[in-house]
Amino acid sequence: MNLENILPKDGPPLDEVTKYIEKYKNDLIVIKYGGNVLIDRNVFNNFITDLSVLNKLGLATVVIHGGGPRIKRELEKSNIQSKFIRGLRVTDKHIINIVESVLIDFNSDIVNSLKNKGTSAISLHTKRNNVIKTLSLIHI
């Protein structure tokens, strides 16, 4: 692997990068990407570039993303007021449809942007992968 062709010119020294590649080459790197960051397209594009570099370096990543600001905006468009208990959104059937739609949209944006950079990426979400099961809570 020719690191000079993968890494940004203004990036860290090659010996530093090599040390971390060796350290994490067999690990799964989990990245939490907040919904606030998704609002700024320049930050988003930088994030996609960084993920693409990690992929080209042979590092395995999983992105867990949010969508809070856009969820809030979509709920407001529908005149729906969210209720929060201890920082957690109380979600009924109508709200979950909006939340799910927003998150799947963000998910697709991330995956498609990575693929456009030549990076292998797959999407995992509730509509296609049955990754989440929920139960109604009577008391929190």
Question: Over which residues does each language-model region extend?
Answer:
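Nucleotide/pyrophosphate-binding catalytic subdomain
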Residues: M1-I138
